[in-house]
């Protein structure tokens, strides 16, 4: 555990040297230590880092492009430099995809469900987040969080996770920005039209939380981050709830939604 913790500290503090691009929170503030109990850190020794969400004691939900060799998973982390007594470390026992983790041809299949090698114990800083019971409404105010960059394009990275409030926007706005997106997809378009707040490099795989439920997974966005009228893309978790719950129930051959 000590070795894993030291490695995680180095990764979080040296994210600017990471080999893989992902998303981070711009324009937010330090998350309250008790508001991100479901937020997990995915990392390896090569410098890859992503976020994820604990959805029950045995499963984490994240983005497919966050798959990495020799993945380690940390739960209950708030500060990269100060250890929480209840932090827990796990390995992935099994990974489930709707699409090959290396295939980026389908915009809305960037989702990965991870079964942990051991169950997680709830604690002061660790608790699962509920899956959505319905999709978010247009205009909903939602919370995005992670250890991603807090400045862009010259990235700097925080010692603690940052949180920001953003809005669910019309899908057509994202489609106008990101050429090649289909007329309909299982993607949420979210951000602030005036810019200044959004996920950024390092936040990939982390949660978009609306009314206390996991509605989105940080998937893709602009570079530099948080540009005016350039919202980011989030996987629409509601459309995958049957797939997720079927796997958790033991049906690991369930068909991914088309």
Swiss-Prot record:
Enzyme type, top EC level: hydrolase
Propeptide segment residues: 19-24
PROSITE patterns: TRYPSIN_DOM, TRYPSIN_HIS, TRYPSIN_SER
Cysteines paired by S-S bonds: 31-163, 50-66, 98-256, 142-210, 174-189, 200-225
Pfam families, A to Z: Trypsin (PF00089)
Keywords tagged on the record: Disulfide bond, Glycoprotein, Hemostasis impairing toxin, Hydrolase, Protease, Secreted, Serine protease, Signal, Toxin, Zymogen
Protein name: Snake venom serine protease 3
EC number from the UniProt entry: 3.4.21.-
Listed InterPro entries: Peptidase_S1_PA, Peptidase_S1_PA_chymotrypsin, Peptidase_S1A, Trypsin_dom, TRYPSIN_HIS, TRYPSIN_SER
TM spans (from-to): none
Region forming the signal peptide: 1-18
Domain Peptidase S1, first and last residues per copy: 25-249
Glycosylation sites noted in the Swiss-Prot or TrEMBL record: 44, 103, 117, 121, 154, 251
An annotated GO BP: proteolysis
Family, per entry: Belongs to the peptidase S1 family. Snake venom subfamily.
Active site: 65 (charge relay system), 110 (charge relay system), 204 (charge relay system)
The gene coding this protein: TLG3
Location (main, coarse): secreted
MF terms (GO), sorted A to Z: serine-type endopeptidase activity; toxin activity
Quaternary structure and interacting proteins, as annotated: Monomer.
Subcellular location: Secreted
Function comment: Snake venom serine protease that may act in the hemostasis system of the prey.
Tissue expression summary: Expressed by the venom gland.
Gene Ontology CC annotations of this record: extracellular region; secretory granule
């Amino acid at each position: 555990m000590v070795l894993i913790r030291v490695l995680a500290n180095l990764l979080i503090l040296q994210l600017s040297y990471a080999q893989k691009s992902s998303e981070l929170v711009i324009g937010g503030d330090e998350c309250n230590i008790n508001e991100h109990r479901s937020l997990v850190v995915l990392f390896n020794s090569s410098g890859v880092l992503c976020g994820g969400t604990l959805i029950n004691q045995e499963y984490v939900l994240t983005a497919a492009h966050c798959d990495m060799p020799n993945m380690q998973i940390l739960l209950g982390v708030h500060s990269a430099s100060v250890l929480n007594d209840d932090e827990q470390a796990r390995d992935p026992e099994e990974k489930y995809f709707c699409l090959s983790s290396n295939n980026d041809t389908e915009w809305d299949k960037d989702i990965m469900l991870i079964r942990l090698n051991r169950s997680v114990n709830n604690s002061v800083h660790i608790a699962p987040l509920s899956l959505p019971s319905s999709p978010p409404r247009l205009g909903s105010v939602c919370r995005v969080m992670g250890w991603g960059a807090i400045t862009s394009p010259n990235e700097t990275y925080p010692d603690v996770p940052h949180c920001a409030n953003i809005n669910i926007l019309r899908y057509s706005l994202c489609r106008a920005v990101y050429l090649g997106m289909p007329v309909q997809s299982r993607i949420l378009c979210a951000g602030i039209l005036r810019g200044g707040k959004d996920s950024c490099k390092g936040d990939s795989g982390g949660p978009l939380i609306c009314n206390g439920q996991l509605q989105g997974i940080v998937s893709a966005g602009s570079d530099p981050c948080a540009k005016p009228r350039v919202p980011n893309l989030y996987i629409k978790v509601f459309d995958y709830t049957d797939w997720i719950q079927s796997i958790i129930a033991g049906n690991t051959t369930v068909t991914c939604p088309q």
